[in-house]
């Protein structure tokens, strides 16, 4: 059995989430719904952005946004503010989501697609946000244009040096703002939509909606902020002077102070190098992957239950070729398999198995532990079927006799995930002499393999 202590990174996450559990209750702990909150914010951004799109005019960007904010303060102004603050919130929750998955180690092996697409979504969001600020064409937009032009000055692809281009009123044409508006809309709607689809593509039944209470709370907070501190224009652009003191959004524009502090070569090295490391993190020092699940065709009856329960769509049904009287048989997609054992718990004919943790080994272990417990303690024995990721095993489990510390009559058998447990395991424990059986898995929203606790509860 695997008796490893929790890493420092996991301790950080569980400490923060434990505090949030006490504050919000586990059912409404926002840290369990970071991804779905991001999806909800994207919906709010799309709705408010669509409203602004109908009123935006590329011939007079500043005047348009000023009119929406002032003349329509009761609706247009609120929509603009929600668009702004929901976008800020998106960056915050994307970073929290990525940071949580990194600290929990949930970005390697079969999860690399979600990690890479998630980082791409973060960078794309920042790009879209910067373009959005440009579309207002106030002093803040002018500063962004100048700073961006200076960053691009070393790239030899421009006929005219970028800083001079952005400082020329002649280049600030209606066509330029049309192109920027098109880029803002297309990248946000099409690009981010595709990335979001890729992000959840390997998850069965992806969760994209937060609990109603959390969604309502987020919306109310955004509306209150919009009323208390509405998003407004900075001063109009003046081509005769360079803007100095302008309102600043650190969530999107943080790269510009960083570029001002660091030498240009070092800035590009940090930016490009950091981005590359972020994207290749799943392959840096990753631990050995656990053997993936295997299917015994002779036991498979084509019921599709393992295919339906798999949290990562790592099992597909293929036509049978062995002449048995079933249309299909299950087949594991190794690259997507998490080795969680959910398919093992789903099957009534024992067709799936984990090479390093078979049901035969588990049943033999249960029988042995119950025999030794009865022999040594001479009293009732209880068996705990425990997800190895749901507890700090070194803290709670006595390694020598596989029991809970201070409770020698409570034997513990660990599983890769609670989703591997089904009624047959419990029946075996009872038939082997257990006076009681309990199952311990991850709490709601916290399952390392997404749906283990859900399936364990449903099967029992």
Residue ranges with predicted function:
Residues 10-13, 19, 23-54, 63-83, ...:
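Membrane-embedded alpha-helical bundles of multi-pass integral membrane proteins
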Residues 58-60:
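Cytochrome P450 catalytic domain signature, combining two hallmark sequence patches
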Residues 244-247, 316-319, 323, 402-403:
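Active/binding-pocket-proximal capping segment
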Residues 298-300, 337:
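Short Cys/His-rich zinc-binding micro-motifs
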